[in-house]
């Protein structure tokens, strides 16, 4: 690629964006074929967008404003991001997000701003009631209504017509609206109630998701949902998003976390999970929590894999391994991809009792088992966080004689994070 000037002079170039000519959807999309193919192989049930801290930013200017991400990319202003050195170009805008959902067969989860900024950028009071900026909440509510109308509104509506103008007359697969990201406290719940009432009145069939405080409050195994009745009518909180960032040791201790969660209240959503520590133990430790989630299927749990992908050039200071690492001309599936896919491809809807026979010196071995009524298969999952091979004797209920089994193994080796 070259730009050949016709005469001497100074040139200023903006919005330089190069794509292969054969992108997904016969060259009509902004997504490379290899990246979309990897996502299709994973087969997500939903995609959460625009994600986390991009939603609330550090002030109103840096919040996610979806209307500014429509239209030709050269007209999109982009925005500074707290995740330096990233600067958002918004090349994947609100419209492209829904197109990606359609390409991979996923439902859409849009995370809307509530006018509350990142809690790390506001002053804290003794009551954990962060002093957030004053905003016109009605404007944020109207903006969210416009966003929903753009996604699923009839083409006779203002924003439904705009969607059609941008090449998509049919509605997009919007299913979830998350009200804020990591917003919490009395101010949040006051705003949540107003937003929920306004949105659900017009769009009652969408599923609305509330936020929780990011840290663990009280005892480590406390149910984060227990304080909801102190702030809002619990009937208006259908799904509750819990985020966790902690150590390997903490993750191992959470293997039974959700067993004691109260039933009959908000459904469980783990929108973000990040375990710090040495590879591969940090990655395997996420499995201990995942087992607790799938063992408690009556909580109707949702789980979002994150981070989904990163560019090769921005991996140096990463903490958490993404599922995909993308370069200029390739997309690599990492160990995280394969671990997550093993869980995704082996789900069950009936939980069964399973344990590891007590062996002296055996620690950090995790097990769960269930029955999948669709495939009529029993599924046994084992995770070994020790740095050596071990011989295990799982104890499972309901089997009177030996049975044939198919084994799938994922071996993670220290120092080889990209490919297992």
Where are these regions (language model features)?
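Extended acidic/polar, glycine-enriched regions
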Residues: 1-41
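Acidic, Ser/Thr/Pro-rich beta/coil linker or hinge segments at domain junctions
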Residues: 400-420
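Active-site neighborhood of glycoside hydrolase catalytic domains
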Residues: 144-146, 150-161, 165-299
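Extracellular beta-strand elements of beta-rich domains used
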Residues: 1, 13-21, 47, 177, ...
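Conserved, mostly hydrophobic/aromatic
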Residues: 43, 101, 147, 177, ...
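Carbohydrate-binding surface patches
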Residues: 363-403
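Aromatic- and acidic-residue-enriched carbohydrate-binding clefts of CAZyme catalytic domains
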Residues: 55-92, 121-146, 153-178
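Aromatic/acidic polysaccharide-binding cleft in carbohydrate-active enzymes
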Residues: 116-119, 265-376
């Amino acid at each position: 690629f070259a730009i050949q000037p016709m005469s001497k002079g100074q040139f200023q170039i903006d919005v330089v964006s190069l794509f292969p000519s054969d992108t997904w959807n016969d060259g009509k999309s902004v997504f490379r074929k290899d990246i979309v193919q990897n996502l299709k192989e994973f087969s997500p049930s939903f995609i959460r967008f625009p994600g986390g801290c991009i939603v609330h930013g550090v002030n109103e200017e840096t919040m996610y404003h979806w209307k500014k991400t429509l239209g030709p990319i050269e007209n999109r202003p982009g925005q500074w991001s707290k995740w330096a050195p990233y600067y958002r170009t918004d090349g994947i805008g609100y419209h492209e997000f829904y197109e990606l959902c359609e390409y991979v067969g996923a439902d859409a989860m849009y995370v809307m701003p509530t006018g509350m900024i990142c809690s790390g950028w506001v002053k804290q009071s003794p009551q954990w009631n962060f002093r957030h900026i004053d905003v016109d909440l009605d404007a944020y509510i109207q903006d969210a209504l416009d966003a929903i109308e753009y996604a699923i509104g009839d083409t006779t509506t203002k924003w439904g017509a705009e969607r059609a103008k941008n090449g998509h007359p049919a509605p997009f697969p919007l299913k979830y609206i998350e009200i804020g990201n990591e917003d919490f406290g009395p101010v949040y719940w006051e705003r949540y109630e107003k937003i929920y009432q306004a949105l659900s009145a017009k769009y009652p069939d969408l599923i609305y998701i509330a936020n929780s405080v990011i840290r663990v409050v009280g005892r480590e195994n406390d149910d984060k949902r227990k304080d909801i009745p102190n702030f809002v009518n619990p009937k208006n909180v259908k799904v509750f998003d819990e985020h966790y960032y902690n150590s390997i040791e903490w993750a191992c201790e959470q293997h039974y976390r959700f067993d004691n969660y109260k039933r009959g209240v908000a459904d469980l959503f783990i929108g973000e999970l990040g375990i710090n520590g040495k590879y591969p133990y940090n990655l395997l430790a996420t499995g201990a929590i995942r087992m607790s989630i799938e063992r408690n299927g009556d909580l109707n749990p949702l789980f979002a894999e994150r981070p989904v992908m990163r560019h090769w050039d921005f991996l140096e200071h990463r903490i958490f391994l993404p599922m995909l690492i993308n370069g200029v001309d390739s997309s690599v599936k990492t160990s995280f991809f394969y671990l997550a896919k093993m869980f995704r491809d082996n789900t069950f809807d009936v939980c069964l009792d399973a344990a590891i026979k007590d062996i002296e010196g055996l620690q950090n071995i995790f097990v769960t088992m269930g029955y999948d009524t669709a495939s009529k298969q029993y599924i046994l999952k084992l995770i070994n966080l020790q740095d050596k091979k071990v011989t295990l004797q799982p104890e499972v209920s309901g089997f009177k004689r030996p049975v044939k089994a198919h084994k799938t193994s994922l071996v993670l080796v220290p120092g080889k994070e990209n490919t297992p």
